[in-house]
Amino acid sequence: AQGGVNMFLQGAIGGWIQPEGVPHTYDYANYYGSSLGKYAYELTKNKSTSKNIFFTSAKVNFPLANPSFQMLSKAGIIKRDFGKTVSSEIAYFTIGDACFATHPGESSPALSLATKSLMDNKGPKFILGLSQDALGYIVKPSFFDMSNKIPHSEYLTGMSIGPATMGIILSTLQMLIKN
């Protein structure tokens, strides 16, 4: 143990993308995790500090298109009121050259990449999924059009609050980043 302060940030967690060409074994997972830890530790040797910290956030009302969330709320399974809209929060912040954006649910790769494209910094870009909320899967609106025949779209949209979610997140982040 090296001591020090640790901070865990949930990354962009959505997407069913599995690595190809690597062993799916405990030994490989242990090797991969140990290698990542050693690399992270090496980065601390050249650390820098910054007093440049910025934070902004916005309350957002998302339209609720999935009645399942309302049923789960009425049954007491989800301890939250779901009406025609659901209120949440989105944040954007910087620490030095690093930028961070939050998504209030499980981020799809498309949402994460679109969010990173909004960030105009030269430093690292971080997407924090399931931040401030857990509004289910956040998928592209095209997933809600069943005529597109996107694999697993029926399941994915069944775990989402609705097709407007991704666009609202991106427009909110764009506003937060520009201000």
How does the language model describe each region?
Residues 1-179:
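Non-catalytic substrate/cofactor recognition surfaces at enzyme active-site rims
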